[in-house]
């Protein structure tokens, strides 16, 4: 689409979202647009420090988990000793950015609001890791903690997956992987999905929205995909294009959150409509006035905190 025809998003977002967009960090260098991926990852981690401040304190433990690809770091957030379930969190970042530090506040709030143990999995980023390595690492971590639940003093009888953006795709893909391959890691009580991508190649929102403000132009989305996938055939894999999977049966209850001015919004809408059409348990909520990635900004933005509370409430209602 000709750029001039796109929606004037920055004029339409909420007052709270505008405050976030206009918040400056004076000691932060400019985004290294032409830098290496290592430099961009470093910048992303530095930029998120401000937004992660002031998160709830709780018992936190770090463990390295063995997988066939090597060791993967995990971080456990334990809000109480008698957790009713364990929720695995997969961070967003277009498959190429992000880590356990960039999403620390999100995981802490989710643990606090749900009173469940939250385990963040620092899956290997792309392009170093290609599909389906991240999913296989997530599944391996889930199996590891299921087998070692008593040693780690966690409740793995009921589990869930949660994620934002690319992490939302990984969350649902991992749940479907466990179902399809009949791997028992505990009952999957729910899946929490904030503004994910689930396999659409094109859509109204992908045409109308997306720009330099969110890093989600059509060119950006293509770049993330090319970094993540091994080959063209992977685009049709039921664990990348999740609409090619069987969404008519045994899908865990899904909380699907959409951001109003997110180019990926139609992915969330289609996922909800598909699940609902086949009587699969699901809930969709649209957060007005928001951009993609708004979940990070709960320090300043009430809507972000609300979205985390909504997800936590949905999950605990399934227990």
Swiss-Prot record:
Enzyme class: hydrolase
Species this protein is from: Escherichia coli O9:H4 (strain HS)
Subcellular location: Cytoplasm
S-S bridge residues: none
Pfam families: Abhydrolase_3
GO CC field: cytoplasm
Residue window of motif Involved in the stabilization of the negatively charged intermediate by the formation of the oxyanion hole: 91-93
Key words, A-Z: Cytoplasm, Hydrolase, Serine esterase
Free-text function comment from the UniProt entry: Displays esterase activity towards short chain fatty esters (acyl chain length of up to 8 carbons). Able to hydrolyze triacetylglycerol (triacetin) and tributyrylglycerol (tributyrin), but not trioleylglycerol (triolein) or cholesterol oleate. Negatively regulates MalT activity by antagonizing maltotriose binding. Inhibits MelA galactosidase activity.
A GO molecular-function descriptor: carboxylic ester hydrolase activity
EC code(s) of this entry: 3.1.1.-
Name this polypeptide is given: Acetyl esterase
Active-site residues per Swiss-Prot or TrEMBL entry: 165, 262, 292
Family matches, as HAMAP family: Acetyl_esterase
Gene encoding the protein: aes
Principal location: cytoplasm
Subunit structure: Homodimer. Interacts with MalT and MelA.
Family in the record: Belongs to the 'GDXG' lipolytic enzyme family.
């Amino acid at each position: 689409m000709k750029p001039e025809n796109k929606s004037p998003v920055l004029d339409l977002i909420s007052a709270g979202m505008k405050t976030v967009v206009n918040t400056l960090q004076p000691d932060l260098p400019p985004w290294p647009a032409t830098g290496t991926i290592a430099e961009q990852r470093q910048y992303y981690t530095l930029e998120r420090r401000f937004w992660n401040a002031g998160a709830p304190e709780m018992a936190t433990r770090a463990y390295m988990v063995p997988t066939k690809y090597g060791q993967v770091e995990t971080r456990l957030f334990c809000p109480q000793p008698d957790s009713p379930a364990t929720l695995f969190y997969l961070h967003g970042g277009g498959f190429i950015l992000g880590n356990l530090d960039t999403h620390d506040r999100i995981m802490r709030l989710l643990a606090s609001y749900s009173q469940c143990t939250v385990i963040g999995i620092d899956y290997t980023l792309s392009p170093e890791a290609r599909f389906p390595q991240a999913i296989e690492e997530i599944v391996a971590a889930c199996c590891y903690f299921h087998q070692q639940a008593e040693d780690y003093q966690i409740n793995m009888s009921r589990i869930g997956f949660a994620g934002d953006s690319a992490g939302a795709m990984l969350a649902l893909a991992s749940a479907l992987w466990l179902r399809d391959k009949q791997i028992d890691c505990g009952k999957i009580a729910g899946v929490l999905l904030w503004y994910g991508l689930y396999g659409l190649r094109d859509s109204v929102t992908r045409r109308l929205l997306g720009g330099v403000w969110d890093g989600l132009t059509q060119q950006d989305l293509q770049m993330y995909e090319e970094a993540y996938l091994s080959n063209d055939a992977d685009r049709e894999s039921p664990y990348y294009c999740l609409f090619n999977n069987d969404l008519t049966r045994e899908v865990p209850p899904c909380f699907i959150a959409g951001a109003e001015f997110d180019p990926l919004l139609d992915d969330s809408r289609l996922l909800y409509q598909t699940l609902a059409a086949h009587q699969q348990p699901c809930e969709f909520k649209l957060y007005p006035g928001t951009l993609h990635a708004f979940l990070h900004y709960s320090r300043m933005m009430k809507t972000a905190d609300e979205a985390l509370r909504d997800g936590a409430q949905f999950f605990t209602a399934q227990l």
